């Protein structure tokens, strides 16, 4: 499984990489990479690790896409000059990564054990082993609970200064 990849690496890289591999008797059950989270970072990791022939497995969770699934217009992502709806962009990212071999399971990770190699990822009571774990679980907004906040989301109340700051250029704003 790794031999085609290893033959192109410098010998010092191979020796360092092999130090982290589990014993040969359990190699068949060990993934090279498990990705936890299915937003833009997760799918980018999936795309690149799949193209590197590392046979990645992604656990996307039951609500993959994160905050972008609630975003109607994304205008600051390269490749979409007219903007794109968040859910549509997530479909595009998933399709592209899967085209190169990313395996996606829409399941939630319950636990990760980093105490020894290979690492253990528990999903719905089942243990998965991997040499590397990429955690790309994203972020979540913290709301104040202020009066009128819910009604004004997306109409002047924003949770992403770098995303929405452009819309408030030359205006008076409050940042909490």
Predicted segments, located by residue:
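N-terminal amphipathic/hydrophobic targeting modules at extreme N-termini
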Residues: 1-2, 6-8, 12-15
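FAD-binding core/adjacent interface of flavoenzyme oxidoreductases
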Residues: 13-16, 21-36, 52, 104-171
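N-terminal Rossmann-like FAD-binding beta1-loop-alpha1 element of flavoenzymes
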Residues: 31-57
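Conserved Rossmann-like nucleotide-cofactor binding loop
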Residues: 41, 63-64, 140
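Rossmann-like NAD(P)H-binding beta-loop-alpha module
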Residues: 47-51, 61, 169-176
């Amino acid at each position: 499984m790794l031999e085609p990849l290893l033959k192109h690496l410098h010998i010092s890289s191979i020796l360092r990489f092999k130090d982290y591999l589990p014993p040969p008797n359990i190699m068949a059950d060990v993934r090279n990479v498990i990705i936890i989270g299915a937003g833009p970072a997760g799918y980018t990791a999936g795309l690149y690790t799949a193209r590197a022939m590392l046979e990645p497995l992604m656990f996307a969770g039951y609500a993959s896409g994160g905050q972008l699934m609630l975003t109607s217009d994304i205008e600051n992502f390269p490749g979409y000059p007219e903007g794109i709806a968040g859910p549509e962009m997530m479909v595009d990212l998933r399709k592209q990564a899967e085209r190169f071999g990313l395996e996606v399971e829409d399941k939630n990770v319950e636990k990760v054990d980093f105490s020894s190699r290979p690492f253990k990822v528990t999903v719905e009571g089942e243990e998965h082993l991997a040499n590397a774990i990429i955690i790309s679980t994203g972020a979540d907004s913290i709301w104040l609970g202020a009066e009128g906040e819910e009604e004004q989301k997306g109409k002047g109340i924003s949770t992403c200064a770098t995303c929405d700051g452009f819309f408030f250029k030359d205006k008076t704003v409050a940042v909490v």
